[in-house]
């Protein structure tokens, strides 16, 4: 629902449109996009072999980031570098967003940079390619 939900926080650009731009910026990366509002679907996706052994994983856990130990455990199984992205500055928002249970599992976290956080994450992963 990016582009429709709370545009004052998340912006007005649909993620699918931004994804096209990311694919243009990083043609050497095979960018695969998965989104679900269901915790179990996210866990099942992360546990797939092609994800666990991917070159890198960028995750925005949304509100799951603040309480889903199950997703954190699934991320621990991923052998690829993990980067967490949050579009908004979660530390400038509600108290419950001050805790992030996914961050300790990730190599890096990009918070509050808008959609550009995804570009920064992919640039980091791209720079590791030999």
Regions found by a protein language model. Give the residues of each.
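Short, well-structured alpha-helical segments in soluble
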Residues: 44-53
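Mid-chain, well-packed structural core segment of small domains
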Residues: 53-91
């Amino acid at each position: 629902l990016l582009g429709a939900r709370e545009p004052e926080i998340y912006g007005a650009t649909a993620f699918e449109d931004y994804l096209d731009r990311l694919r243009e910026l990083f043609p050497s990366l095979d960018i695969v996009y998965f989104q679900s509002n269901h915790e179990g679907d996210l866990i099942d996706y992360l546990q797939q072999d092609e994800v666990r052994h991917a070159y890198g994983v960028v995750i925005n856990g949304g509100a799951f980031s603040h309480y889903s130990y199950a997703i954190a455990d699934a991320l621990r199984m991923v052998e690829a570098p993990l980067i967490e992205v949050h579009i908004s500055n979660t530390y400038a928002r509600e108290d419950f967003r001050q805790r992030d249970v996914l961050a300790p599992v990730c190599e890096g976290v990009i918070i509050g940079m808008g959609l550009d956080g995804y570009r920064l994450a992919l640039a980091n992963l791209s720079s590791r390619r030999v």
